[in-house]
């Protein structure tokens, strides 16, 4: 959105093939690293409430973030809008890949120049999110565990 205060921080053009380097650029300093930001917590709560079907609670958390960023409060929020907001808010923080996997969305393939070709995008099967359960664990007389799908 044009009035989003974050727009000026990330909109530009570059064809050098490098990714953003901002959140953890100085790993040798003694400053505390922020592992989770409150904005991510708001987005996580929004997503959880949307998935549970509680749109009113989802909208409350979503609008907290929007108004912090100088945007007008939304009347509704959908999962699609949440996905776009996570992209804007958490850009360069290393979370996008995991978001795409969690949502079951294709992971885009980028060339060195940053160009994408949707034909090259990858959908990651669910069994690649979990490890196989060792046979020894499944054979235990106290276990009723079944193998994870795909193994």
Short names for language-model regions:
Residues 1-151:
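Acidic/polar-rich alpha-helix caps and helix-coil junctions
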């Amino acid at each position: 959105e044009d009035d989003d205060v974050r727009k000026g921080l990330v909109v530009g053009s570059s064809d050098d093939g490098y990714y953003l380097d901002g959140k953890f650029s100085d790993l040798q300093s003694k400053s505390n690293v922020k592992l989770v930001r409150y904005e991510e917590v708001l987005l996580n709560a929004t997503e959880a409430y949307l998935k549970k079907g509680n749109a009113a609670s989802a909208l409350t958390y979503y609008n907290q973030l929007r108004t912090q960023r100088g945007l007008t409060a939304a009347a509704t929020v959908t999962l699609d809008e949440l996905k776009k907001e996570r992209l804007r808010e958490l850009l360069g923080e290393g979370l996008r890949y995991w978001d795409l996997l969690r949502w079951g969305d294709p992971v885009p393939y980028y060339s060195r120049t940053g160009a994408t070709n949707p034909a090259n995008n990858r959908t990651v099967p669910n069994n690649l999110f979990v490890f196989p359960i060792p046979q020894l664990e499944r054979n235990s007389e106290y276990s009723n565990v079944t193998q994870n799908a795909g193994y």
